[in-house]
Amino acid sequence: MAGGSEKSVFLKWSWFLEWLTPDRATLKHIEDVIFQGRSRFQEIAVVRVSGEGKVLVLDGKTQSSESDEFMYHEALVHPAMILHGSPRKVLILGGGEGATLREVLKHRSVEKAVMVDIDETVVNVAREHLREWHRGAFDDPRAEVVIDDAWNYVASKAETGFDVVIADLVDPLEAGPATRLYSEEYYRMVKDVMNPGGVFVTQAVSISHLTEYHAIIRNTVARVFKHVESYGVYVPSFDSMWGFVVASDDKDPRILGDRGFFETRLSHQLQGAELRFLDYASMLHMLNIPKMYREAIAREKRYATLDNQVFLPA
């Protein structure tokens, strides 16, 4: 689940103005407002947008769109799951729409998937209005939905022994609830609830519009895990190449670029489950970030701690 910004506005509920950066915005035509409300944590809306279908909007920021959510969620979930090879127990941090859970449960080895989201209202709205996203995943007997703060859940070690941890969190905005969830301290706590040989993956903001912030997330993860790799995919509803960071102490993510490795594991793990976006060609493309972004990522040396937090521009 990406995003979160106060600089977005519905104009007479006909047009949706969304700021991607302080100097870049998109304008989308709204056909219908399906749901609008507020939880304890954020403004929530489900709208129908021309050319995109249903769109989940939190605090004025697009989280995912019916037309292309599968691109984001398949890209977030499957590389980490394939890298591990046979994950039995998976932790999802965030992911209130249920689509991340949906993708995790496609893997034949999964015996239990725990989804932790702070906002019960978002989960309930998704259950009712975003069935195209979760497709019944909330009711799968392997799924457990926990309403809790992702920091508290991990810090308390309410459960351990996870093979894969997937962070599908809102962006680290200064006024937002997720900033500390991108810190070195948090990533170390996450590692403590993982099994040896586990794999961690996080959404890591826009590579094309917020390159330095993607690099900071990568650098922070790299202080905790031995092997770290960035990858990205252009998501039309985000108008951006969206970034991800995958990491492990034991498994080098670059092996995902090996065709035999990738296709053998994908076929074994999914056993015919439908993927609309991800195959070997797409994986190879995601790993090959354009040169100018790779160079910018390499130049950035900052990382985030609780005492030295880095916020996205509001």
From Swiss-Prot:
Keywords, in A-Z order: Cytoplasm, Polyamine biosynthesis, Spermidine biosynthesis, Transferase
Major site of localization recorded for this protein: cytoplasm
Pathway listed: Amine and polyamine biosynthesis; spermidine biosynthesis; spermidine from putrescine: step 1/1
GO cellular component, one term: cytoplasm
BP terms from Gene Ontology: spermidine biosynthetic process
Domain (PABS) ranges: 13-249
A Pfam family: Spermine_synth
Family, as annotated: Belongs to the spermidine/spermine synthase family.
This protein's name: Polyamine aminopropyltransferase
Organism: Aeropyrum pernix (strain ATCC 700893 / DSM 11879 / JCM 9820 / NBRC 100138 / K1)
